[in-house]
Every structure is written in structure tokens, then in C-alpha cells.
């Protein structure tokens, strides 16, 4: 089972952006392999990015859109040229400020690239924020 949370840091940053009139831009997904991650427990909304040694991949947001007046979606596609790594933690950030907006704790997943005649896998990840 996966767990999802919008961080308190994002809520504060979003309010700050509103005050200054600057856009709220979430532009990068971060994939990590966090040892001992318990996906059955709720996420602490104060959680930060994992240490650099646990981050296995970063990928730009490829699509975003408004679902309704209270929800937006951000998506990325990890193509067959990306890999090999395993991940159980995904975050959505504003790259310029390094603000972590949303977190998913998930069961361990593999991302394999195409090599030596073996077809890799293609993964799409989408985060819906309400």
C-alpha cells in the first residue's frame, strides 16, 4: 500500500509565493530508494528530501494540468532509456527553491532501461494535488 502527503513546507512556500505574486511552479520529480521505509505508516508532513546517497534519479515534470478548480496534476514519463534503479520514495519539488511539495511512499519498484537486446520498462508517474 502507498502513502501520500502534501508537505507543510509546500504549504508555507505556496503562501509566500501568493504574497509576492510569484507563480507556484513544481517542475521536478525525485526518485529515491530509502532503506527500511514502512509504506503502511502515514507520512510525516515535515519530511524532507532523502539524503543525496539515497536519490537514484531526477526527472523533469513533462505534463501538468488543471483537473478542476481545486486540483492540479503533474506527470512524468520514465522512458525505456532510463535506468537501472529501484525506488520506493517519490517527491515532487520546485527545483529553484528545492521545496518539497508532495511525497509518495510506495512498495519497492524497479526501473529498467533497454540494454543488450532486453526491452526496458516505461513508467508514468502522476501526482494529483487537491
Protein language model regions, located:
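N-terminal assembly/attachment segments of tailed bacteriophage virion structural proteins
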Residues: 1-130
Amino acid at each position: 500500500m502507498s502513502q501520500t502527503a502534501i508537505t507543510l513546507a509546500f504549504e508555507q512556500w505556496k503562501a509566500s509565493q501568493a504574497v509576492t505574486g510569484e507563480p507556484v511552479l513544481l517542475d521536478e520529480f525525485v526518485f529515491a530508494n530509502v532503506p527500511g521505509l514502512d509504506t503502511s505508516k502515514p507520512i510525516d508532513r515535515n519530511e524532507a528530501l532523502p539524503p543525496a546517497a539515497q536519490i537514484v534519479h531526477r526527472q523533469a515534470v513533462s505534463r501538468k494540468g488543471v483537473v478542476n478548480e481545486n486540483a492540479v496534476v503533474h506527470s512524468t514519463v520514465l522512458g525505456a532509456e532510463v535506468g537501472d534503479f529501484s525506488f520506493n520514495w517519490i517527491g515532487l519539488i520546485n527545483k529553484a527553491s528545492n521545496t518539497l511539495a508532495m511525497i509518495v511512499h510506495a512498495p519497492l519498484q524497479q526501473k529498467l532501461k533497454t540494454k543488450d537486446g532486453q526491452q526496458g520498462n516505461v513508467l508514468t508517474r502522476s501526482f494529483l494535488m487537491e
